Amino acid sequence: MKRRAYISEVPFDEAGSDDRNIYLTFDDGPNPHCTGQILDVLAEHRVPATFFVLGGHVKDHPDLVRRVAAEGHLVANHTMTHPDLTACDSEAIEREIKETNEAIVSACPQVAVQHIRRYGAWNADVLSRSMNAGLRPVHWSIDPRDWSRPGVDSIVDAVLAAARPGAIVLLHDGCPPDEIGNCKLTGLRDQTLSALLAIIPALHSRGFSLRSLPQ
């Protein structure tokens, strides 16, 4: 499949299986209609996670990024405007990476950005420029396609069926800037939120620990 043509080169598809750790990750935020509710659930269950934030959204909602960091979660780079980096020239790739890092650090000076993820599409140029910026490329191993709103049970079942030590779960706490006009913002990620309320205790009951990505 084209979007995974270079996935064997991405060093972080899973995060190791020595311990029974699973890593919840959230893309496309911060979003004032979603992120705070996700954070509330994570706080209730004392679960740390990793948030791959869009630089443009960070500029619009720096308070939410500060809350993410203050509550012990990892803040990571999801590019500035959500392009397919494999379709960008080298200058655009570097700009997307650099401006997002700058937006994050401007909002949260204490944050050291160490990870990047975008689209699941990678090529040699994107990988090298990400790593040259000091960022570790991250993919995922469980994708319940929560962004498509398939139903709460579908999201829960997809995660639990594929759960294994070291798994990286892809979820969403917002939507890309080019889709906001077509999104119903209120309740945008209500299925993700409801699924999370079931996923966390179910994984704990199976003996898994939930962590933010290793640094």
UniProtKB/Swiss-Prot annotation:
Q: What is this protein called?
A: Chitooligosaccharide deacetylase
What subcellular compartments does it reside in? Cytoplasm
Which positions does the site annotation Raises pKa of active site His cover? 146
Q: Summarize the protein's role.
A: Is involved in generating a small heat-stable compound (Nod), an acylated oligomer of N-acetylglucosamine, that stimulates mitosis in various plant protoplasts.
Q: GO cellular component terms?
A: cytoplasm; membrane
Indicate the segments forming the NodB homology domain, all copies: 20-211
Q: Which key words tag this protein in UniProt?
A: Cytoplasm, Hydrolase, Metal-binding, Nodulation, Plasmid
Name its species: Rhizobium leguminosarum bv. trifolii
Q: What is its main location?
A: cytoplasm
